[in-house]
């Protein structure tokens, strides 16, 4: 759904995906 995501590097896509799936866990991971 986010057209911008596909333009980002893989690690950035994973970063955004983590925030969408588990925001609380993403805060610890990053």
UniProtKB/Swiss-Prot annotation:
Query: Which GO cellular component terms are attached?
Result: extracellular region
- Please provide the record's keywords in A-Z order: Acute phase, Glycoprotein, Protease inhibitor, Secreted, Serine protease inhibitor
Q: Where in the cell is it found?
A: Secreted
* GO molecular-function terms, A-Z: serine-type endopeptidase inhibitor activity
**Could you state what the record's PTM comment says about this protein?**
N-glycosylated; contains bi- and triantennary glycans.
Q: In which tissues is it expressed?
A: Plasma.
- Which GO biological process entries does UniProt record here? acute-phase response
Give the chief site where it resides. Answer: secreted
What domain notes does the record hold? The reactive center loop (RCL) extends out from the body of the protein and directs binding to the target protease. The protease cleaves the serpin at the reactive site within the RCL, establishing a covalent linkage between the carboxyl group of the serpin reactive site and the serine hydroxyl of the protease. The resulting inactive serpin-protease complex is highly stable.
**Similarity section:** Belongs to the serpin family.
- The molecule here is called Alpha-1-antiproteinase
User: Which species is listed as the source?
Assistant: Chinchilla lanigera
């Amino acid at each position: 759904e986010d057209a911008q995501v596909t333009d980002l590097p893989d690690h950035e896509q994973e970063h955004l995906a983590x925030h969408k799936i588990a925001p609380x866990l993403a805060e610890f991971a990053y």
